[in-house]
A protein has these predicted regions:
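Short, acidic/small-residue loops that bind anionic groups at enzyme active sites
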Residues: 85-103, 116
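Conserved small/polar residues in nucleotide/adenosyl-binding loops
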Residues: 157-163
């Protein structure tokens, strides 16, 4: 049975570390590769490594990219590769361990990168929890659709991110 190939992409060795963690929990996986952007490397180095990872998959028709950070170099370079395969490939940013494990489990029954990508987002979000529970954000009412906001739109107005020039 053909399985969706998974590229885990990150700044630094995060991708290799989370690959190891996922294997400890779920077992060794075929057609999964970690692709890292190291401090001494540039976008072209990363892209070449990503292309080599994809070429190593037994089936390159269906590829899912799990990326650490939306808008960073690993995302931008995987996005460049993705552009020619939008109908089959998918990218999910915000990589965490629940996301990776759910992707592994989903590959057993789901045959498309799009299907897996859509499925793992909720699990990834649910993996972010806090104790004590009262520190958790209050559930916002699901009224975005009525207010005319486009479906699937996400608002980041509540986040204050540091400005990082080198990503």
């Amino acid at each position: 049975k053909k399985m969706v190939g998974i590229v885990i992409a990150s700044h630094g060795q995060f991708a290799e570390g989370i690959l190891q963690s996922g294997n400890m929990i779920f077992g060794e996986q075929e057609d999964v590769k970690a692709v890292t952007l190291m401090p001494s490397e540039g976008p072209d180095d990363f892209k070449a490594k990503a292309e080599a990872a994809i070429k190593s998959f037994s089936d390159q028709d269906q590829v899912l990219f799990l990326v650490d950070l939306w808008g960073g170099t690993p995302f931008n370079q995987t996005n460049n590769l993705f552009e020619e395969h939008k109908d089959k490939w998918a990218i999910v940013a915000g990589l965490n361990l629940p996301m990776l494990i759910e992707a592994y489990a989903s590959r057993l029954s789901m045959n498309s990168a799009h299907e897996i990508a859509a499925h793992i987002i909720e699990t990834a979000k649910d993996g972010v929890k806090v104790k004590p529970e009262e520190l958790a954000p209050k559930e916002a009412p699901k009224a975005a659709a009525k207010s005319g906001a486009s479906a699937g739109a996400v608002s980041y107005t509540h986040l204050t991110l540091p400005t990082i020039c080198s990503v």
